Amino acid sequence: MFMSTDEVRRAFLSFFESKGHQIVESSSLVPANDPTLLFTNAGMNQFKDCFLGLEKRAYTRATTAQRCVRAGGKHNDLENVGFTARHHTFFEMLGNFSFGDYFKEDAIQYAWEFLTDVLQLPKERLLVTVYETDDEAFDIWNKKVGIPADRIIRIGDKKGGKKFDSDNFWQMGDTGPCGPCTEIFYDHGDHIWGGPPGSPEEDGDRFIEIWNNVFMQFNRHADGTMEPLPKPSVDTGMGIERISAIMQGVHSNYEIDVFQTLIKAAADAIGYQDLTNQSLRVVADHIRSCAFLIVDGVMPSNEGRGYVLRRIIRRAVRHGNKLGAQGAFFHKLVGPLAEVMGTAGVELKKQQALVEKVLRIEEENFGRTLDRGMSILNDALDQLSGQVLDGETVFKLYDTYGFPADLTNDVARERGFSIDEAGFEQAMEEQRQRAREAGQFGTDYNSLIKSATNTEFCGYTASRGQSVVREMFVEGAEVSTLSAGDKAIIVLDNTPFYAESGGQCGDTGVLKTDAGIFHVEDTQKLGNAIAHHGVIAQGVLATGDQVDAIVDEKRRAAISLNHSATHLLHAALRKVLGEHVAQKGSLVRAETLRFDFSHLEAMTAAEIKEVERLVNQEVRRNHSIETNIMNIDEAKAKGAMALFGEKYDDQVRVLSMGDFSTELCGGIHASNTGDIGLFKIISEGGIAAGIRRIEAVTGEGALDYLDAQQAQHDAKVSEMAAKAKLLEKEIQQLKDKLAAKESAGLINQVKQIAGVNVLVAQLNGADNKALRGMVDDLKNQLSSGIIMLGNVAEGKVGLIAGVTNDLTNKVKAGELVNMVALQVGGKGGGRPDMAQAGGTDAHALPSALESVDAWIAERL
């Protein structure tokens, strides 16, 4: 029987709903209140506190289709993705859970029923494993389910491992909840190599685990003793990709409908024909994790979850580049993904535009350095004498070209090499140590190069100019000529290019002659010289050549806005938090600004809001940004702030923005504060003891950020409104059911007056809105009769009278209810067959209802 992945998902959830389980939505990929976990990687993550007894929910049975990511930390599948049939960065885990409700027998019976009755898998294709001492689970499988003993495998502890160190024994840690588990395997047939679990050939692909049932029945103490839990629980997980492969008659997860759709979409976006290529599998997998991480609020960055996302994006982009992708392609897969995910893609559809934009920008940014980085990596591999690429080269690719180490490892592995991971980590640690010692941003580029040139900087007033090449260096050695492809450092006699300093990154652009073009990828200080780092894109270049030096004006303009905003931010922080605030580092780029400052505690939401208000106030005032050259002592006397870690000459450049900010600064700035447009803080957090970090965006970047936040907010509001409406409906349904139940009990209180059925009763705490339905039910049951009900709820009296149509010529409901209402401090009326009223005197209600019989008798 063929089933699509979406059909499998819906069948699983519906089956367990029929067994009394509450369907719970997938939680975010960013775990809530669990700092130990990088990403949600199992269905049980959102129920962790339920299993630990720290949280009680309205249900004791739950079922989910949980989105999971394994691409960082302990559970890291990234390096295997695309190279095996079943490794993914993103997957969905189907699960059913019992929190002290049912246990082993029901869990096993449910699993077997779903697999063999709902999915109709051949029983002879299934075999199971149990923990070696779990006789209870063995007997359930054997005697209750009927699986032959030779298809139930006992799995013990790993050789040389600790007690309970087994694939069939689950434990949260050295202490705490733990217990045995039973796993269900599917036999793909003897045409595929591999043996059953526990055999020497168990790593083959013939027998594939499809479902794991964990039985949390013990609490392990520090001394190793196992105490039975008073309410044992069940945690199960079944990867939807694996079971879908079986239902679709394929062996590899990448052959199921979801991946085939994405592989075809990737091939179309890239312009590649061979759908069996492994790189397409990598791209198809990675779009799932990247898209859903962004949906759940993770954005590409150089830290934490954001860096894992960046690594995955760059790995996908590199594989697309390998297949010949021209321009950005990765973001084009978001639409096909949203469609093929079916019921699991609803949220992605809502945020599709945001996800596409984030991916496109990230891909374009990486694309600027990808080709050159690949060229350097391939050259290094070509020249390799052994089989291991040194850690320094791996680090250089990471540090200069944004190549994550696992991306470099992928390329090396494709060519039969490996990387020196230990050497890379050592280089990383050395960089961290330099950063700690310096207490600021920036790296000492080419410290061994010595230049005799004193470059004149002319970039404050111009972004292009005529210059002469004074010196050129390749890999630290001075050269006189350069040709196409050479990566080099060029020193000019004068330059409009700003060298990285004071946290502002260096300019990029081009150096042009009639004979060649040099792409400047970075600009750094080299003693008194300014070093242009880059590569010869075409032609040749020689010492003494005259060049047109042209800065990337758009990028510089964006940087200048962020730099000016940094000054306003610094001043605003000192006004809001206090004069103790001092800059401890900064990074000003075209996309964002980052500002580190001294402060002992996290900023409150109110403080962040006030800082933003002050900065934007100064932006709207549109101060002219003025610069003056003066003696450093004079500058300090005027209150100019000096930047942390910077060295100053006797004569300094003082930058002023009205009377709000005055700082010593040699950077490039906007002309007026109004040019900044808008300032928005996007994050605030601690990076070390007493050091906080703010990241912010300006201008169009701020607008883009706000648009993205608004999109997420709107989606959440819509979701909450829909849930609230559903809850209101469910509450009313429950009230109606309760009223119907109460009306069934009232029928026994019917009396006869002059041969007519009469029911007079008082209720307490009933829902007044439900009384009308209750009277309708009673009228239907009596066929002929008169009903008068009084109810006291929250100190108020509710009255309702009902008369069947055959009696309205004698007794009218409106008159009856008004008679009672007048006695309880109210009044009312209505139709002859149905009328309602209210009152304020609850104490008078019993006597008022006692008067009803006589009133009715007078009219019959």
Swiss-Prot record:
Residues where Zn(2+) binds: 563, 567, 665, 669
GO biological process, one term: negative regulation of DNA-templated transcription
Location (main, coarse): cytoplasm
Cofactor details (free text): Binds 1 zinc ion per subunit.
Compartment annotation: Cytoplasm
GO cellular component terms listed in the entry, alphabetical order: cytosol
Presence of keyword Repeat: no
SUPFAM superfamilies recorded: Class II aaRS and biotin synthetases, Putative anticodon-binding domain of alanyl-tRNA synthetase (AlaRS), ThrRS/AlaRS common domain, Translation proteins
Keywords for this protein: Aminoacyl-tRNA synthetase, ATP-binding, Cytoplasm, Ligase, Metal-binding, Nucleotide-binding, Protein biosynthesis, RNA-binding, tRNA-binding, Zinc
Pfam families: DHHA1, tRNA-synt_2c, tRNA_SAD
Catalyzed chemical reaction(s): tRNA(Ala) + L-alanine + ATP = L-alanyl-tRNA(Ala) + AMP + diphosphate
EC number(s) from the headed UniProt entry: 6.1.1.7
Keyword set includes Calcium: no
Cofactor(s), by name: Zn(2+)
InterPro entries assigned to the protein according to its UniProt record, in alphabetical order: aa-tRNA-synth_II/BPL/LPL, Ala-tRNA-lgiase_IIc, Ala-tRNA-ligase_IIc_anticod-bd, Ala-tRNA-synth_IIc_core, Ala-tRNA-synth_IIc_N, Ala-tRNA_ligase, Ala_tRNA_ligase_euk/bac, DHHA1_dom
Any one Gene Ontology molecular-function term assigned to this protein's record: zinc ion binding
Stated family: Belongs to the class-II aminoacyl-tRNA synthetase family.
Function: Catalyzes the attachment of alanine to tRNA(Ala) in a two-step reaction: alanine is first activated by ATP to form Ala-AMP and then transferred to the acceptor end of tRNA(Ala). Also edits incorrectly charged Ser-tRNA(Ala) and Gly-tRNA(Ala) via its editing domain.
Record remark: domains: Consists of three domains; the N-terminal catalytic domain, the editing domain and the C-terminal C-Ala domain. The editing domain removes incorrectly charged amino acids, while the C-Ala domain, along with tRNA(Ala), serves as a bridge to cooperatively bring together the editing and aminoacylation centers thus stimulating deacylation of misacylated tRNAs.
Name this protein carries in UniProt: Alanine--tRNA ligase
Organism: Vibrio cholerae serotype O1 (strain ATCC 39315 / El Tor Inaba N16961)
Name of encoding gene: alaS
